[in-house]
A protein has these predicted regions:
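HDAC/HDAC-like amidohydrolase catalytic core signature
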Residues: 1-308
Length: 308
């Protein structure tokens, strides 16, 4: 089982204000834990800069232009109440998209069985025409559409276990039955979407979790909602929106998962990738704001990807 890792120094240069939870130290914590000899077999690749035209797979041109115009020449500019930009943010965003699309290329051409993209800023809150929740563009949605356009994937599944609902991914694929979107998330919690009755064209599966939910309820949601949907859909590619803020240490939510839960969930999705997708699985970093919880969870996730 070949596992590839994409990252890039530019991801550290997307600067947020002091005290902001989505900060460069998140990537530093991940880099430190993956430097351990246990991960020596990782195929480490510097993320390529993305093709800006692929942003249009998920977002209209006028919105893309507005976001680009909001990037400051110096200092920090506010995109919305939670989302800020610094001078290198555009390059970071474009490189994150480039890494995700390259990961899709890798799993379709056989260069890797699965790929983890350690990039920031995250993407799953970005709607078609709205940047929000620390997110500029929806990297997972762009990668899904890229797989369809570049590699002829007929069905792509996006599984999102970030503690916050991926309202952006749901918005983009709401009426697109060629993409399955499955989400486990705390509810009530930002952004307030993700109720069970939000089903789109029958391609949206939301499994909201009550505050203080632990391993048993999370795993039951996977077993009863997410995995049956994947088996019924039989995707050609599985993309994980891999947020690790459902970890019990995370300050932004109240779900009590451990790194073992992310190991288990990764294994379950790898089984489905083996069954339906020729092992093709791409994992994209989303949230996770306690540095220790994030590092331990990523280590468990990537370790499972490598074990097969």
């Amino acid at each position: 089982m070949t596992t590839r890792l994409y990252t890039h120094p530019i991801f550290l240069e997307h600067i947020t204000p002091p005290g902001h939870p989505e900060r460069p130290d998140r990537l530093r914590a991940i880099e430190r834990v993956l430097d351990d000899e246990a991960f020596a077999a990782l195929d480490r690749v510097k993320a390529p800069e993305g093709d800006e035209a692929t942003i249009l797979y998920a977002h209209p041109a006028d919105f893309v232009a507005r976001v680009r115009a909001a990037i400051p020449d110096e200092g920090i500019a506010r995109i919305d109440a939670d989302t800020t930009a610094s001078p290198k943010s555009w390059q970071a965003v474009i490189t994150a998209i480039g890494a995700a699309n390259a990961a899709v290329d890798d799993v379709f051409t056989g260069r890797a069985d699965n790929v983890f993209v350690a990039a920031r800023p995250p993407g799953h809150h970005a709607e078609k025409t709205t940047a929000m929740g620390f997110c500029f563009f929806n990297t997972a949605a762009i990668a899904a559409r890229y797989a369809q356009r570049k590699h002829g994937a007929e069905r792509v599944a996006v599984v999102d276990w970030d503690v916050h609902h991926g309202n952006g991914t749901q918005d983009i694929f709401w009426d697109d039955p060629s993409v399955l979107y499955c989400s486990t998330h705390q509810m009530p919690l930002y952004p307030g979407t993700g109720a069970k009755n939000e089903t789109g064209a029958g391609n949206i599966v939301n499994a909201p979790l009550a505050p203080q939910t632990g391993s048993e309820v999370f795993r039951d949601a996977f077993l009863s909602r997410v995995l049956p949907a994947l088996d019924n859909f039989a995707p050609d590619l599985i993309i994980i929106s891999a947020g690790f803020d459902a970890h019990h240490r995370d300050p932004l939510a109240e779900i009590n998962l451990t790194e073992d839960d992310f190991d288990w969930a990764t294994g379950q999705l790898m089984q489905r990738a083996s069954r339906h997708s020729g092992n093709r699985l791409v994992s994209l970093l989303e949230g996770g704001y306690d540095l220790q919880g994030l590092a331990f969870s990523v280590a468990a996730h990537v370790g499972r990807l490598m074990k097969g």
